[in-house]
Amino acid sequence: MSKVRIYTLAKDLGVDNHKMLEILDGLGVSYKSVSSTIDEENVEIIKQILADEAAEGGDAAPAAASAPAAATAEPEEADETPAAAAQADAEPASDLPHRAPVVTIMGHVDHGKTSLLDYIRKTRVAAKEAGGITQHVGAFEAKTSKGKIVFIDTPGHEAFTTIRARGANVADIAIIVIAADDSLMPQTREAIAHAQAAKVPMLIAINKVDLPQADPEKVKTDLTQLNLVPEEYGGDVIVVPVSAKTGEGVEDLLEYISLTAELEDLRADPKGQFSGVIIEGRVDKQAGVLATVMVQEGTLHVGDFLVVGENYGKIKAMTDSNGGRIKEAGPSTPVQILGFSEVPSSGETVVSAKNEHAAREIVAQRASDRRDEEDARERRKAQRSLADLLGPLGEVHTVNLILRADTQGSLEAIQGILARKETEDVKLNVMLAGIGAPTEGDVLLASTAEAQILCFNVTPSAAVTKVAETKEIPIKAYRIIYEMIDEVDRLIKGNLDPVFEEQYLGRAEVRMVIHHPKSGNIAGSYVTDGMFKRNAKAKVTRGKEVVYEGTVVGLKRFKDDVREVQQGYECGINIDWNDVQEGDIIEASEMVEVEPR
């Protein structure tokens, strides 16, 4: 009995993939994705359902009760219903028009990423446009039967993660290219880890299948070691054999990209407020500052004012992926912009302003907000309640690790020990484990995923150390394996729910109340015991009754603001409470972390 893939049947019958999955859900047919196969019996049932709907003028998916008992999936397919999940996540934005998917291609340096992009360019971009595309905006648009696909041509996964580290999600789909004659290499594992950290759908392209020594089955088997199980093995990872040299499988890859985009239901409002992301910025000797922007929402026009971080500019000229001048650009369109005075950083968000005055106001407000945040950060830390410090009870903490070692044996030994170190409260997640010194990509991944980099018998280069210092990512290197394990023990201990105790600081007697026009009533006090600190907890006692509990928001000695006042000195105490009275006793305390008992 022959079988047919779901997406192929949907295409042949002229319905979209979501509709096809709804019908299968109604029939009770199990599948893993739109590339799963169904048998002839179910194909005939689906055709009849669609014919009946066409005759009735309806489009509802059949109820499960109407499904024949024999309607079952192939045994290798798993019990999941993506259509139902997609419906549950549906947003009102479903009325918005679809946009093109934005795809990034990553993988090991010699596995053919550039060759694959070049082949797609050659066959999917008009000949007059293909030359010199990369020198314009680092991206290009490929035309397919399902619409356009935008490919970002960035130099490796490090650039991808730099954008992610700033909180931007510029890519919708990641293609991991793996050579059929080489299988998984260190950079392949890194690329997969970066894509997983970004939480974007992944497609695996096994390249160079035209070579005599190609072994795509080995690649698929090796992928399972990373918990990436191909569909033909019963998993949910789409694996496409391709050849960037002959073009074999490239059409299938483009089809799978379109199918993934359809299931992701990518939409944007071209009439809405503009927003975008900086892909890269550079200085051209002749033109000046150029910025590549991916339009995500709204439409960009020449003459618009844009704000990036604490800088703004007016679009003087705009270039599309072909190097041609354009006047406007909608969602999922990469453009190169001339108009900024300073080079923006990759991953920064871009918003529009009505005019220059509005742009200046946005920049001024952002600068003010940044200063306020810096000023308030210490105070917020000091004023956290005990509940804030403890966090949710029973929460399982995850420690993300990036491991580097000198040999595979060392790496396996370390991972074996780590597997025995996990507790009910703390989970150790090894995001990446590789042989050799840590790379800049490791640092960027650690920055994005809040991971720790631990090295055994290898040390980072000066360049990597400099990047790590800039990103404030510590790289810890060890020569003795148990010193590394001791560090892991410290990390586990540091991720356990902390234990805090309230410790007494001091006591003061209110001798006069001073009214301040801005700060309200200040307690003119004498510290009779211990000391007082700014931001300490304060408890006011009147007689034997506690009348107020709050925070010491300010301390003064004469006219000077001070951080603390010792026993035997007078001071002004501001507890942000106007009902303080002479004779009140103010007691100060602070929350101090103690060793778990």
UniProtKB/Swiss-Prot annotation:
Stretches assigned to the tr-type G domain: 98-271
Low complexity: compositionally biased ranges: 57-73, 81-95
Compartments where located: Cytoplasm
Region annotation G1: where it falls in the sequence: 107-114
A molecular function GO annotation: GTP binding
Keywords attached to this entry: Cytoplasm, GTP-binding, Initiation factor, Nucleotide-binding, Protein biosynthesis
One record GO biological process: translational initiation
Entry binding sites for GTP: 107-114, 153-157, 207-210
Superkingdom per UniProt: Bacteria
InterPro entries xref list: EF-G-like_DII (IPR053905), IF2_II (IPR044145), IF2_N (IPR006847), P-loop_NTPase (IPR027417), Small_GTP-bd (IPR005225), T_Tr_GTP-bd_dom (IPR000795), TF_IF2_bacterial-like (IPR000178), TIF_IF2 (IPR015760)
Region (G4): 207-210
One Gene Ontology cellular component: cytoplasm
Region (G5): 243-245
Region (G2): 132-136
Residue ranges of the region described as G3: 153-156
Stretch list, region Disordered: 57-96
Family label: Belongs to the TRAFAC class translation factor GTPase superfamily. Classic translation factor GTPase family. IF-2 subfamily.
Function of the molecule: One of the essential components for the initiation of protein synthesis. Protects formylmethionyl-tRNA from spontaneous hydrolysis and promotes its binding to the 30S ribosomal subunits. Also involved in the hydrolysis of GTP during the formation of the 70S ribosomal complex.
Protein name: Translation initiation factor IF-2
Species: Deinococcus radiodurans (strain ATCC 13939 / DSM 20539 / JCM 16871 / CCUG 27074 / LMG 4051 / NBRC 15346 / NCIMB 9279 / VKM B-1422 / R1)
Gene that specifies this protein: infB
